[in-house]
From Swiss-Prot:
Protein function: Cytoplasmic adapter regulating receptors of the signaling lymphocytic activation molecule (SLAM) family such as SLAMF1, CD244, LY9, CD84, SLAMF6 and SLAMF7. In SLAM signaling seems to cooperate with SH2D1B/EAT-2. Initially it has been proposed that association with SLAMF1 prevents SLAMF1 binding to inhibitory effectors including INPP5D/SHIP1 and PTPN11/SHP-2. However, by simultaneous interactions, recruits FYN which subsequently phosphorylates and activates SLAMF1. Positively regulates CD244/2B4- and CD84-mediated natural killer (NK) cell functions.
Naturally occurring in which organism (per UniProt): Sus scrofa (Pig)
Protein name as catalogued: SH2 domain-containing protein 1A
Region (Interaction with FYN SH3 domain): 67-92
CDD domains: SH2_SAP1a
Modification sites for N6-acetyllysine: K89
InterPro entries the record matches: SH2 (IPR000980), SH2_dom_sf (IPR036860), SH2_prot_1A (IPR017289), SH2D1A_SH2 (IPR035876)
SMART domains recorded: SH2
Main location: cytoplasm
Assigned keywords, A-Z: Acetylation, Adaptive immunity, Cytoplasm, Immunity, Innate immunity, SH2 domain
Any single GO BP term: innate immune response
Length: 128
């Protein structure tokens, strides 16, 4: 999971929401560990000022699955990256297609902006 750039690990729901709201872009998304269910992940998506959270889990057979809107056919994916790619398309049972990945930067990287101030080394938004 660490190879997935939108995976932020064990961050709180509040921290994830702040990261998404800071983008201001509907369709911004990230993955984090679930706080309430061990071994489960949360796919968090910004839409119209609200954060929508979908549980993502790794099945016993090694597939990945996401809990989506009721009535939507459950799909299984071999890799988490395939799940993310599928949800970048419309009508997949989530509120809006995944559009703007909020990626976690390596903590070893630190940048200075044009103003000379240190920018946040932990997160950046990747636009298509």
């Amino acid at each position: 999971m660490d190879a997935v750039t939108v995976y932020h690990g064990k961050i709180s729901r509040e921290t994830g929401e702040k990261l998404l709201l800071a983008t201001g872009l509907d369709g911004s998304y990230l993955l984090r560990d679930s706080e309430s269910v061990p071994g489960v992940y949360c796919l968090c998506v910004l839409y119209q000022g609200y954060i929508y959270t979908y549980r993502v889990s790794h099945t016993e057979t090694g597939s990945w699955i996401a809990d989506t809107a009721p009535g939507v056919h459950k799909r299984f994916f071999r890799k988490i990256k395939n799940l993310i790619s599928a949800f970048q398309k419309p009508d997949q049972g989530i509120v809006i297609p995944l559009q703007y990945p909020v990626e976690k930067k390596s903590s070893a990287r630190s940048t200075q902006g044009a103003t000379g101030r240190r920018e946040d080394p932990d997160v950046f938004l990747k636009t298509p």
